[in-house]
Amino acid sequence: TMAGNIFNVLIVHPALPAPSVKALIALARARPGELNYGSSGTGAADHLSAELFQVMTKTKMVHVPYKGGPLAMIDLISGNLQLMFSTVPTAVGLIKGGKVRAMAITNSIRYPLMPELPTVAEAGIPGFAVNNWTGVFVPAATPPAVVTRLNAEFVKVLAMPEVKKRLIDNGIAAVSNTPQQFAAYIRDET
């Protein structure tokens, strides 16, 4: 069962002279190879988000991989990095505190607790969408009746208003689907 979609955000150092995604693209094109971005490691979702951004915008920036997102975030706050992609839960306190500036949500929909923040697609890169998700798995040999029961219980829990609120407050939109839908989604994405 898919349990939720995790919201991600493009964030920049507050001093970066680009007030919008379009301005960031223009700056990166004007200064190829001069802007840098951090990631939690080579091949991680935030790294791949930045690579997709570069491909879709025909820009070139320097990748600075770290051994974890918190180390990259420290360098973004200190100004050693210009930008990075992050999960909303990791970045929201820093955004609210003015330590970093949010430019856009990478998901295909806006984050409900920051409705003023456009998606990257809305901000100037049509078709850009990076959606991370979380789900519940069981061993392949689990009896179908057990899978059905577990799914029903997870769907009930995910439908509870207090659970939905707790998830969205932490940057996750609750999703309830069937095991078959989840399996099809995974097949389609891989």
Locate the predicted segments by residue.
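Conserved, function-defining micro-sites of small-solute handling proteins
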Residues: 1-190
